[in-house]
Every structure is written in C-alpha cells, then in structure tokens.
Amino acid sequence: YACHPTKNKEESSMRSSVDAAAFYKAMTALMDIPAKSPVKVLQEIKVEFTSDHCTLSATDFGTWLSVTIPASGDDFAFVFWNSAGIQKVCRYFTGQLELELSGQRKSQIITMRCGDKGGKFPVYETEECPTWPEFEAKQSYTANAANILKCVKQVKYAVDLRSTRPEYQGVLFQNKHIWAVEGHRAACCDDGGLSVEKPFTVAVPALEHLKVFGNTDIQIDVNERCVTFRNEWIRLTAHCVPNATPLIYENIVPQKWNEEFCFHRKDFVQALKYLLACVGKTDKPYVRFDNGALTLSLIHI
C-alpha cells in the first residue's frame, strides 16, 4: 500500500465502488485537460459519486470535459491531489475498485483498494473546484464525433493562433462546411454530416478532445457563448471563439474556376516532398502545374 500519514482519530467515512478499468480509462481521457496553473485545483480531476454513477471531470476554464461510469455505494465527491500520479497507479488495478473518503474538513483522505493493491492519498474539497457554465441551447444537431474530428484534423493547418482577428483563431462551422481561414489560405471539409443554421467558431485544442467519444453519434448544443458535445456518458463543453466576425464561406472561397483537375493526395504530397528536398531552407519556391507535370522554381532563378 502507498500511504499518506493521517491523524489517529475516529472519522466517518463514505465508500463506493467502480470497475477499475473503466475508472482508469476515464482518468486517461481527462488527463489532457488540466492546465499548468497557479490555481492548484485546475491541475486536477474531480470525482463525484451520485446515486448509481461516478462522474470524473476536469477543466482549464476554457474547456470542460466529464466522463460518467456506473458505480454503487454512497454519495460523495472530492478532487484528486496529484491526478497524474493517481492515474498511473490506477493502471495496475483490475476488477472492482473501492474508493473510501475519510478524514476531517480540509484534511480528507481517499483510500483506494483493488484486490491486493491500494493506497491512501490526500484530496481537495470540491467547493474549491469551478462549476460548469450555465448552458441553454439555442441550436441542437446530431453528428458522428469521428467524422467531425476527421474534418478538424484536415482543416486545422489553416488556423492562425497568433492572429489578432478572432475569426482566424478557430474552426468555423457554417452550413455543411467545417472550415478554417487565416488570411492567405483556407481549408474546408464537408464530410462532417452537419448542417448548421447559425455559424459558430471553436478553438482547435477544444475540438481535439472529441477523440474521447470515439466513433459514436453525439448531440451538439450551441448558444452564443458555448458549444457542448455529448452522449449518454461523456460531455465536452467549450467556449466559442469570442467576438469572431462570421465569415461567409461563399465570399472567401471561389465558387467558379477557370480550370479544374484531380489528383491523388498521397502521390501529390510525395512528389511535393521530393521537390522541396532539392531546395534550401531559406529558399521560397513556387510550384508550377503544367500539362500533368509538377515542377518547382525558385524566385531568383
């Protein structure tokens, strides 16, 4: 057992149990959320047992993520102290995991037992943990999380986090388009399975947490300030990029072309890498498309 010294006095305790593998999976999904912050509780994971379920959650004040798993036992809540360390410990638990909260106010201890393994760890009280933002949906949609995440990965290269224009700092959802633009280039994906009534913009780091949903259908709720992605067990809430002037896709991306041609993306990237290997790092090459040939010229040649 890994132990933390406590005072020897009679203490009331509350206990509940969960599946160890599900608890570890939930903690792992949340580990990317806690931020390096002078506010200690923002670096940790909150655990709340209510009725027949256990909800683990974390926030950095810009993004909130919670994962709910089945549980049985008493109702209680706490915030881990050193969540990263606890997550590593939970990796070795299998079967039924029992958690027991004991101790006096401001000096509570969580005891974790699983077979012949276990430990005692200090915890924070939940009153120090920020609450989720109040949310009233103005728009609601249903889509596949994996499809949306795939689109985000395809277009995020056109996001400019250093731009002073908010609309360039995130991924825009407009009609069927999931797209991004940063002044010099735009990227668009129409395979997200959405048809958005009122455009909204979300930062890439928040959208990358969609991976926790896997290949499942989710509900998307949107209002002026936030967007929530959720299913029965997982909820992800993020602030929309504030003060973003809605960009109109049709005004940014040309709708008519003088010429169109198709190519295999993998072959094109391979050919482009070959050409770029022939130039120096300080050169600024231009790629020329001419009658099926791909050539590269330097500005000073």
Region locations from a protein language model:
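Structural preference for solvent-exposed beta-strand-turn elements
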Residues: 2-298
